[in-house]
């Protein structure tokens, strides 16, 4: 088993469909549901979207633009395999699938939907709930 450590740089909540992402200093992950007060809470495989800062920088985006919940410092999260465990603060998440680029991305930047293929982010489900705070250590275990 390999382990990688990084840290949480941003946390966002989506309070309603189509609403702007709200930056927060911390969030509460709820086992089997997602993040408290996030509209995606309760979805089975799409509870939390995680992106890394390398992806944000590579495409010249602002944090929150990809509708991500959590941004991790550095690179290498995109393409994480299903079943990978990510410990964020007090919470433990499991990678369920990579997030496919959608039409919304071309509204942000022409061609982004095609360009970001394979780097859109990683969707997770919450295995163990807990508080997640900006600056917390993130431990990724394959």
Please annotate each region the language model reported.
Residues 1-142:
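Metal-cofactor-dependent catalytic cores
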């Amino acid at each position: 088993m390999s382990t990688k450590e990084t840290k949480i740089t941003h946390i966002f909540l989506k309070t309603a469909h189509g609403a702007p992402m709200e930056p927060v200093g911390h969030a509460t992950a709820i086992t089997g549901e997602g993040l408290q007060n996030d509209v995606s809470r309760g979805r089975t495989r799409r509870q939390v979207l995680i992106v890394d800062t390398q992806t944000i920088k590579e495409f010249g985006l602002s944090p929150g633009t990809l509708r991500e919940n959590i941004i991790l410092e550095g690179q290498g999260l995109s393409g994480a395999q299903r079943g990978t465990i990510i410990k964020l603060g007090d919470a433990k998440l499991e990678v369920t699938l990579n997030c496919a680029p959608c039409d919304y991305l071309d509204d942000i930047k022409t061609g982004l939907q095609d360009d970001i293929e394979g780097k859109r982010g990683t969707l997770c489900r919450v295995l163990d709930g807990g508080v997640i705070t900006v600056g917390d250590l993130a431990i990724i275990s394959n």
